[in-house]
Amino acid sequence: MAYPFQLGLQDATSPIMEELLHFHDHTLMIVFLISSLVLYIISLMLTTKLTHTSTMDAQEVETVWTILPAIILILIALPSLRILYMMDEINNPSLTVKTVGHQWYWSYEYTDYEDLNFDSYMIPTQELKPGELRLLEVDNRVVLPMEMTVRMLISSEDVLHSWAVPSLGLKTDAIPGRLNQTTLMAMRPGLYYGQCSEICGSNHSFMPIVLEMVPLSYFETWSAVMV
């Protein structure tokens, strides 16, 4: 999860987020090399006496600065497209959960069970227990099995929302009248926090998301109690 004065991304918990972190590092290195080259050229221009000021044409230089950016864009685009296709894949999900955004809370329905659904509201600051996180705790967590593919069906009942959990690499728009889908798989147990990431009204900041990833045996016990 996030911490105060954090500069980097959250620790990855899913394979998709691992890929996103690698892509971030890959792109950042390219940006660093380009920035270094530009700063080097600027320093040369400031410290070196200019020559060939009357030159009006340089075919070789123009060829290089046309081809080189194209190669750089390809090096960025190919891994990006690979990750985009990975994020759109739905690989035989073991469980499906329908998420509906409201002003200003989330409701969840486990579609593989007959009567397993609930609303999830933020716990007000004055009701928090010691150690709980302000603006992030909810009264009903979304309990899911770890190391299993879970499909999330996401929609909205009123205005645009966005269901996002950074450590899992998830961010999907909740649009009224439309059902979007995404998949998640957590590689380790724990609590993973997210928030609505689309401005949806005055209480937009009070729509947290809490996923509790647990072993399959614990999930089966929890679902039996809830049903």
Curated annotation (Swiss-Prot):
PROSITE patterns: COX2, COX2_CUA, COX2_TM. It comes from the Eukaryota. Its EC number is 7.1.1.9. It catalyses: 4 Fe(II)-[cytochrome c] + O2 + 8 H(+)(in) = 4 Fe(III)-[cytochrome c] + 2 H2O + 4 H(+)(out). GO terms for biological process: ATP synthesis coupled electron transport. Keywords: Copper, Electron transport, Magnesium, Membrane, Metal-binding, Mitochondrion, Mitochondrion inner membrane, Phosphoprotein, Respiratory chain, Translocase, Transmembrane, Transmembrane helix, Transport. InterPro entries: CcO_II, CcO_II-like_C, CcO_II_C, Copper_CuA, Cupredoxin, Cyt_c_oxidase_su2, Cyt_c_oxidase_su2_TM_dom, Cyt_c_oxidase_su2_TM_sf. The modification Phosphotyrosine is found at residue 218. Mg(2+) binds at residue 198. The keyword Transport applies. Binds a dinuclear copper A center per subunit. It is found in: Mitochondrion inner membrane. Cu cation A1 binds at residues 161, 196, 200, 207. Residues 1-14, 88-227 are mitochondrial intermembrane. Its main location: mitochondrion. GO terms for molecular function: copper ion binding; cytochrome-c oxidase activity. The keyword Nucleotide-binding does not apply. Component of the cytochrome c oxidase (complex IV, CIV), a multisubunit enzyme composed of 14 subunits. The complex is composed of a catalytic core of 3 subunits MT-CO1, MT-CO2 and MT-CO3, encoded in the mitochondrial DNA, and 11 supernumerary subunits COX4I, COX5A, COX5B, COX6A, COX6B, COX6C, COX7A, COX7B, COX7C, COX8 and NDUFA4, which are encoded in the nuclear genome. NCBIfam families: CoxB. Belongs to the cytochrome c oxidase subunit 2 family. This is Cytochrome c oxidase subunit 2.
